[in-house]
Amino acid sequence: MISPTVIRWLPLGAVLLHLFEEFVWPGGFAEWYRWYRPERAASVTTRFLVWINALFVLMALIPVALGFRQRWTTASTRSEPPGTPYGAAFWLVVASIAAANGLFHVWAVLRTRRYSPGVVTGCIVYLPLAVFGFIYFWRTGLANLPTLLQAALIGPAYNVYAARNHRRRAKSLA
């Protein structure tokens, strides 16, 4: 079994791998997205991409900082750091947003029949991470059904919000 300490870091590792694929190797996400959605191209600035991805990296650090507990506790041993019930919830939200992003990349590839920077890590990292996390937190009792359902809905809801926001920003910048 994977240690909870390692599990806390998995979303951050996944996000960093995905960003590496999108922007370093092979890179080209910004150009690809502007080609894929020309009506939103004005909204996809370097400043926006840095800001939104920095925010996602920070979100992935929240479970690391909070830890996992069913209730607020204090450390009972040196090997068991204090945690909160919110660590698992944030972990699941990050995984849900990541999985929705992975599905966005898959949809774009199927629609265009062209490589989308981020589709590989979206498929082999983001989607399995979300499946693993939802099963793990349910089986360990670290997340209850309402928490799981809310997290599962936040990911797709964020993608819908982001698409609408890109449209709005592009119109105001045009």
Which residues fall in each region the model found?
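Cytosolic, membrane-interface loops and tails of multi-pass inner-membrane proteins
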Residues: E22-S43, N165-A174
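N-terminal signal-anchor transmembrane alpha helix
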Residues: I2-E22
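Hydrophobic alpha-helical membrane segments
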Residues: V93-H105, S116-F137
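Membrane-interface helix caps and helix-loop-helix hairpins in membrane proteins
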Residues: W72-T73, P82, V106-S116, F137-L142
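Non-cytosolic membrane-interface motifs at loop->transmembrane helix junctions
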Residues: R111-I124, A143-Q150
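Transmembrane alpha-helical segments that form the membrane-embedded catalytic/substrate-channel core
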Residues: L16-F23, A98-V109, P156-R169
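Terminal transmembrane helical module of multi-pass membrane proteins
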Residues: A130-A174
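Core segments of transmembrane alpha-helices
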Residues: F48-F68, A100-N101, V125-A130
